[in-house]
Amino acid sequence: DVCSSDLQERGIFMENTSEKKDKNSVKKPLKHICIGLVAHVDAGKTTLSEGMLYLSGQIRNMGRVDHGDTFLDNYETERERGITIFSKQAEFIWNDTSITILDTPGHVDFSAEMERVLQVLDCAVLVVSAVDGVQAHTVTLWRLLKQYKIPTMIFVNKMDRQEADREKLLEELKNRFGDGCVEMDMQSEENRESLAMCDETMLEEYLSGGKIEKETVKKAVAARKVFPCWFGSALKAQGIEALMSGLCEYAPSAEPLPEFGAKV
């Protein structure tokens, strides 16, 4: 397990996890979403899942792939090689939402295992390394997400690295995947304008009042007109809370099944 001193060395100064778990467990969740984490190998996908589970209070310590002690990579072969081979499932509550995350293999040799998971997702989080940018396998993943019509959000990881350039990375995402890739910092007028340009309804709302309703954004995400982008560092637990809150606000959730009933 990772001790507190190691977390501090990585720049993580978190509030008490038991308190956070209590805060997110008090209320009964109003909705449930199933999220798949997909990425090219070494983008930091498993570290992101580790951060989500830690911040939501589901695990007491953040493991590391290079230490071989992550929660979801629990097969010996995975820990020895430092890669995910089998898809794994975990659940946590954040705000008013119960979230199931599926951590999928990033290595191209195990793409079939990853693709098998796509059909059950409400939304995908495509993890992109700020160091490597969009890779060939990232493009392959994007095409699969498009083929299965899966609403997609993007988390640009490793922003703590010196060579990471937010503006260049966002420009690359737009060039490769379209103008629907929008950074979800709505404090920025430029970001609000970029979001408004993705959909006529959002543009009308923005022009009439200067703001866009969250439900309107959620519909645009479901229709794959908008691909919300967040930037952070999974290793240092930076940007993860914003991503999780964004999932709660904008990720479409499956319609609940009607209660079964029959006359005998």
Which ranges hold each PLM region?
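Short, small-residue-biased leader/transition segments that mark boundaries at the very start
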Residues: 1-4
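Structural and coupling elements of P-loop NTPases
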Residues: 9-264
